[in-house]
Amino acid sequence: MAAPNNPANDCTGLPSSAVLEAALKAVVPSAAGGSATGTNGGLDFPMWATVVNRYGVICSVATSGSTADDAWLNSRVISAQKAYTANGFSRPTFALSTANLFTPTQNGNSLNGLQFSNPVDPRVVYRGNPTKYGTPDDPMIGLKPGGINVFGGGVALYSTGGKLGALGVSGDTSCADHNIAWKLRNRLATAGFSGVTVANRVPGGVRSAQVGSSNQPVAPSGDDGIMYGSTGFQHADCGNGEKNVVLPAVNN
């Protein structure tokens, strides 16, 4: 984890790469390198996960694959991009997931072009020894990846004291990525470290009870859950059973 002497590099309350890996493997099935029963929808492929702090600096990176290229290699960068996006567009009292940005950024919609702003920094995401990818020595740790991602898989992380940062996952369909990120955020509250003290804590968001899914209970003040459709802050249905997956409830 990044050294906390510089406030921008403070990863207090956020998981180490080892804790992140253990939590990730607990929410994906054996086909994806994990131990979970059931499926998250999608392809059940090995996953990447990245956590950033509230300034967008990477604190930890992990994979559920046995080697760096067991999962889609490009998804390592995408997971970092998703974490950076979810953090940058979530406030202490209002969360936006990357899934919430899908429809607003399509052609003709109000946020079209957002995905081309704040590009990924290639000097960060492609640096270093590839054999270190997804380990506690991942070369991205301690740096800002940049990038804006506008499909499922990135969610903010909150404690009772406010926003801690965000996590991003990638390696499957974008809808399955959202499901895994949602479950992973919930798991991190019980993974044996301080900080994310309330499972799936989200103080508010664009999803309300009127547009929620029975498989994804909505927090009273709204949350950053995925909504399937083509209007507002909705996301395309990936078509591989992802929308039928039962997800943990959200807490305010």
Question: Which ranges hold each PLM region?
Answer:
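Flexible, solvent-exposed loop/hinge segments and secondary-structure transition points
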Residues: 2-252
